[in-house]
Amino acid sequence: MTAICTLENISLIFGDTPIFHKVSLELPIGITGLVAPNGSGKSTLLSVLHGQASVTGGKVSWRRRHHLVKQLNPRLDLRIVDCLADGHLYEVFLRVEQGHASEDDLISVADYWHLPLTWQRQLEEAKINAPLDTPIERLSGGQRAKLSLAYAFSLSSDYLLLDEPSNHLDQSGREWLQEKILNHAGGALVASHDVELLENVRQIIEIYQRGLKTYGGAYSAYMQQKESEQAALLQRAEDNRKEFNQLNNVRQKSLHNFATRQRQGKGKRNSQSKSLMDSQKDRAGKGLGKLKRKLEQRQLQLEKKREEISKITVIESQRLRPQKLSLTKCDSRKSIQLHLENLQLPYGSHDKPISLTVRKGERWRIAGGNGSGKSTLLKVIAGQLKALSGVCQTRGSLCYLDQGFSFLNKELSALENLFYLHPGRKESEWRTMLGSLRLRGDTPLLPLRLLSGGEQLKVALLAVTRGTIATDLILLDEPDNHLDLDSRQLLVNAIMDFSGAVLLVSHDLSFINAIGVDSQLNLD
């Protein structure tokens, strides 16, 4: 199988933390999945492949052009056309259309007359119904994601490095994404927790203990192989424990038998001649030396078995160690937490007035396609945007978690952000809470921009839910994005235990059902 890209003995260290150690890999033609728990280095590996992260050892060799699509949205000061092509060409086409084009303008677009139709087709396929000069900040998170992906798929011969590409996409957007990936001739490496998307890959690469392991087949085949590996690992641990106990029993028995023979021999030697006693003493010395060597060998075997058992135990404990997250208790005695009446949104395709009453303990889903106004509605409720008209009343305190964690300073560390937002808590308290979310060691001290999307989300969840003020209403804008399956279950459990009201935007039906959504507002 021809390799598109080769990694040779790649090593990477952040501070004192090793991320990869002498990793080698060949990326084949076609679609490959990349999986790992949050914070294991998926985004970092994509940056290494793209040449944006400097390695401490080894080299990366490409045989094809490649393009990276990051999790982060495009710059908000750009227009749609700037994300699809050189904005200068768009300005030239405008002057041509208006009859103001110069001779230099006509020369500059001589080979690009097809571009305006291409841009329009890309927007139509991605279901982005907006003019080319629309500012990016006016688009929803899903529309921004599709815009970045649409440009990537236009590079038909490039190998694509896609970082959580299904994040923020509605169901039709996810179907569009799957079709585009399957039909992309250049191939792709897809880092994702989206099981449905990973069922379309030819093989899966797993980041495992600072290295990489490759599994043939799609996600379901990968899970079967992982389960077999886990069963074999546990069986090996059990076999090692049995062998350890047997070796230890033999060692103890040998020591006991030798001590018994020594006591019996001492009684006999008291009645024997000196020459005979010397001869027996010599034989006993040789026997003792032989026994010592035998016991030393047994001791080495015991230590080896103990080390193997310890390694397996550590691996298993890391896999099974539960994360902990609890939301602050609802303090309000009022039944109604939110009341909307004839609310008119400032942005989004939903142009009808919205009326809604949310009571304590209710779980509401805000449904609708990308661009319908779901995030806009949450921002209006949170007081970050002003409605065109209508009534928006909240009672008690609310927490709002937006898609981009905009309230966090990405240049500051997790601890610095938490101290700034909640100065009343001690460092030891934040350390304990971060550790319970598997953010340990130097990780809480690194700038947030160096953490994975899932790790940043955990910090954001702590920031909005673990302050000293109780929360009555929580607004969550696609919180299941970025999270691995284990962390997603953690969030489900926390929401289920919360006694206040929840307004949720999500496109993941399994997540929606898991948290017990009992009501829905549809903006389509």
Feature-to-residue mapping (PLM):
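ABC ATPase nucleotide-binding domain signature region
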Residues: 31-32, 44-104, 363-372, 376-429, ...
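H-loop (His-switch) and adjacent beta-strand-loop-beta switch element
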Residues: 201-216, 515-524
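ABC-family P-loop ATPase nucleotide-binding domains
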Residues: 75-141, 403-472, 478-481
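Flexible loop/N-cap segments at domain edges
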Residues: 303-406, 423-424, 428
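Hydrophobic anchor residue at the start of the ABC signature
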Residues: 149, 461, 491
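Coupling and communication elements adjacent to P-loop NTPase active sites across diverse families
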Residues: 2-13, 92-142, 225-347, 359
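Catalytic Walker B motif of ABC-type/P-loop ATPase nucleotide-binding domains
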Residues: 160-164, 169, 401, 472-478
